[in-house]
């Protein structure tokens, strides 16, 4: 099979497309013929091992898992003897933030990281639905939102931001989305009630006050956004921030929040992937959640895909279409 091989940390150029043996599922795994995967921010951070402490998970000196990729969709071709919920021929999708090995024609994974694809959803839509929504849901669920409150989403057209805008609709809050001019109509369609065009104004100088500011691209900071928050307001970033400040500041704000007007920042660790997948599957089945797709690459173009995502200007998700010939 064709697979992207990743044997050392570094920029996208360290990735190599190779011919490898098709994996064999263990007793607790399924073998998936991959039809679509993505390149996302998680993948880009992982191949570089930045920040450095990621290596505690991915491997200290070199990658433990040598095929990258976290999101996937495809068809089950074999199941281990302990598999209960899937059978050969099932169309499935899923996500593993610690590495699914999905940048390949075939992959294996445990059944808790996958779900069947709704009948009304394509392989591409399914593959692009998980990473952003998983992070967005985990972050949003850490805030006690109430009907009619005001929420600002910076980076509203990335994978995480576009998912957040859609999920926030179900809390019946007023969403202000920050995006570029070209994406104004998109974020309105996703559910934003107000839009700030960052090419024309600095959203941190906005006079509106918010109960929750969600920086879905990690390009701002708690200190820059603190004046946007109402008393008791919360700032969350999807990024560690400069010198990992978004980890350390949440440890400090409970102590000094009285001096900050009871404003605080938190940095939730995303958990419960299966819970996120079930939510997104349910919303997709009802036509209430749509994957935003920026563009498509092939496995042969994997380096170009990573470089494109690293530029930080994608709209939604970047798809990798995985082609198969009669032999695969």
Indicate where each model-derived feature is located.
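Mid-domain Rossmann-like dinucleotide-binding core that forms the NAD(H)/NADP(H) cofactor-binding site
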Residues: 127-197
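N-terminal glycine-rich beta->alpha transition that marks the start or flank
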Residues: 11, 20-73
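C-terminal capping/lid region of NAD(P)-dependent oxidoreductase domains
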Residues: 288-295, 306-328
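Glycine-rich phosphate-binding loop and adjacent beta-alpha segment
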Residues: 220-289, 322-328
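A short acidic, Gly/Pro-enriched loop at the edge of an enzyme's catalytic core
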Residues: 204-212
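A glycine-/small-residue-rich N-terminal strand-loop-strand element
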Residues: 71-98, 174
């Amino acid at each position: 099979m064709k697979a992207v091989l990743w044997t050392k940390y570094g920029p996208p150029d360290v990735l190599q497309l190779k011919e490898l043996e098709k994996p064999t599922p263990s007793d607790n795994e399924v073998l998936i013929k991959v039809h679509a995967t993505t390149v996302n921010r998680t993948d880009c951070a992982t191949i570089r091992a930045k920040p450095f402490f990621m290596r505690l998970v991915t491997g200290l000196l070199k990658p433990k898992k040598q095929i990258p990729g976290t999101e996937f969709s495809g068809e089950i071709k074999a199941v281990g003897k302990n598999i209960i919920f899937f059978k050969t021929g099932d169309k499935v999708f899923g996500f593993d933030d610690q590495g699914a090995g999905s940048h390949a024609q075939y992959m294996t994974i445990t059944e808790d990281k996958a779900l069947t694809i709704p009948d009304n959803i394509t392989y591409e839509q399914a593959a692009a639905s998980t990473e952003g929504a998983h992070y967005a849901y985990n972050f949003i669920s850490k805030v006690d939102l109430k009907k009619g409150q005001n929420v600002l989403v910076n980076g509203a057209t990335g994978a995480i931001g576009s998912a957040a805008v859609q999920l926030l609709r179900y809390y019946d809050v007023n969403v202000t989305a920050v995006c570029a001019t070209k994406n104004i109509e998109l974020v309105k369609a996703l559910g934003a009630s107000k839009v700030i065009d960052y090419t024309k104004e600095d959203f941190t100088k906005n006079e509106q006050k918010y109960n929750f500011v969600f920086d879905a691209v990690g390009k701002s900071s708690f200190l820059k956004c603190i004046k946007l928050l109402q008393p008791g307001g919360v700032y969350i970033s999807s990024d560690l921030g400069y010198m990992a400040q978004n980890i350390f500041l949440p440890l400090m704000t409970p102590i000094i929040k009285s001096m900050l007007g009871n404003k605080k920042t938190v940095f939730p660790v995303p958990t419960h992937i299966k819970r996120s997948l079930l939510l997104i599957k349910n919303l997709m089945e009802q036509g209430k959640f749509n994957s935003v797709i920026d563009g498509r690459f092939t496995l042969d173009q994997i380096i170009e895909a990573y470089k494109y995502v690293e530029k930080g200007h994608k709209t939604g998700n970047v798809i990798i279409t995985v082609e198969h010939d009669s032999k695969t």
